[in-house]
Amino acid sequence: MEEVTVYKISDRAKLPYKQTSYSAGYDLYSAYDYVIEPMNKELIKTDIILKIPNGYYGRIAPRSGLAYNYFIDVGAGVIDSDYRGNVGVLLFNFGSTQFNVCKGDRIAQIIFEKIAYPKIIEVTTLEEINITDRGNSGFGSTGLK
């Protein structure tokens, strides 16, 4: 990927920014002030529109400091290459106190990832998907420690 084009909808918008040369994610910033009550959610607008190259998408991920210190998490975090709207970040407050988001705060990070577009083929028998030794064992089946 060579470049992602960014359009700022308002003067409140900030360009995504990589804090270090080898950071995987680019910080995203709130364009407005918000209050997120405990055990609630808010859609935080960034006031940016992205043009992500075909073959890539943007994955919205939490900022570790917000998650660790304030119990703030991110949901619904996929920005497709053909999306051309205001990038919003769904923040969940799993903490016991309200969380204030101020204009200009770093709220999440976007990681640009390569994507595959496989053809989906329906089969009519279970044998056609090659059953493995693991089978349908999931959620802790390979050990908890």
UniProtKB/Swiss-Prot annotation:
Any GO BP annotation: dUTP catabolic process
SUPFAM superfamilies, per database record: dUTPase-like (SSF51283)
Lineage: superkingdom: Viruses
Keyword annotations of the record: Hydrolase, Magnesium, Metal-binding, Nucleotide metabolism
Gene3D superfamilies for the chain: 2.70.40.10
Cofactor(s) required for function per UniProt: Mg(2+)
GO terms, molecular function: dUTP diphosphatase activity; magnesium ion binding
Pfam families: dUTPase
EC number annotated for this UniProt entry: 3.6.1.23
CDD domains in the cross-refs: trimeric_dUTPase
Stated family: Belongs to the dUTPase family.
Name of the protein this chain belongs to: Deoxyuridine 5'-triphosphate nucleotidohydrolase
Lineage: Viruses, Varidnaviria, Bamfordvirae, Nucleocytoviricota, Pokkesviricetes
Annotated gene: DUT
